[in-house]
């Protein structure tokens, strides 16, 4: 009995020493146009390779692109035997102004342009310089999005009268773990992402109130009872 316990302890210790997970630091500046619910974004991502592997490519999720007629999610929802009743054929019937869109304009690695390809809900990126174990690299991106009519979780103009419900709305780096990359096309299932920190600036019409996770950095400027003092902002826009 004593030998068995000792061996089990050694096995657990060995596993703990070999455990690793990747890490990301996001910085994003978002400008939302509430006249048509489109947004422009700039993203800076610092990716730390804590794995024992050399990384030569990365993938991003572009979830909003699933909300277009003919997408894998649309086809699946219309052809499986037990479809999600919230979806069904609703994506197929969307007008273009109500599509979900997420498109990349440019992408750089450590200041150098790199090759990328949009494959519906997945962005494939070939790194200009391999990312070695223990190293970091900075990926800078310019992108544009369009918020879809709310069908499932995320979208605009829901039945509760909320203009924007934003989930999985930005280009999100896919997970890399001991099994490799997980660039799964989005078909309405669960999400899997990299552990990290986010700094996000959202500029929107100042008549809107933004609710979300995280810590508000400019409480006195925002007002709405967040801070002790309220400083009125000139103009029509406000950055949260």
Where are these regions (language model features)?
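N-terminal, polar/Ser/Thr-rich
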Residues: 15-40
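Beta-strand-rich interaction surfaces with strong enrichment in secreted/lumenal proteins
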Residues: 17, 28-30, 45, 112-115, ...
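Short Pro-Gly-centered flexible turn/kink motifs
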Residues: 132-141
């Amino acid at each position: 009995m004593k030998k068995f316990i000792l061996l089990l302890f050694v096995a657990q210790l060995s596993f703990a020493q070999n455990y690793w997970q990747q890490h990301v630091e996001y910085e994003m500046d978002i400008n939302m146009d509430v006249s048509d619910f489109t947004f422009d974004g700039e993203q800076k991502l610092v990716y730390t390779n804590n794995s024992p592997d050399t990384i030569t490519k990365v993938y991003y999720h572009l979830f909003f692109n699933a909300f277009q007629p003919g997408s894998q999610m649309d086809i699946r929802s219309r052809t499986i035997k037990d479809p999600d009743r919230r979806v069904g054929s609703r994506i197929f019937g969307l007008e273009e102004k109500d599509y979900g869109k997420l498109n990349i304009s440019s992408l750089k690695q450590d200041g150098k342009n790199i090759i990328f390809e949009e494959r519906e809900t997945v962005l494939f990126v070939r790194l200009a310089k391999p990312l070695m174990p223990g190293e970091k690299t900075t990926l800078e991106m310019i992108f544009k999005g369009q918020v879809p009519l709310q069908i499932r979780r995320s979208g605009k103009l829901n039945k509760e009268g909320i203009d924007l419900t934003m989930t999985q709305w930005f280009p999100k780096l896919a997970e890399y773990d001991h099994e490799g990359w997980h660039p799964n096309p989005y078909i309405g299932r669960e999400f899997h992402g990299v552990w990290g920190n986010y700094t996000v600036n959202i500029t929107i019409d100042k008549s809107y109130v933004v609710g979300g996770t995280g810590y508000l950095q400019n409480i006195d400027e925002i007002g709405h009872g967040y801070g002790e003092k309220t400083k009125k902002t000139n103009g029509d826009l406000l950055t949260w």
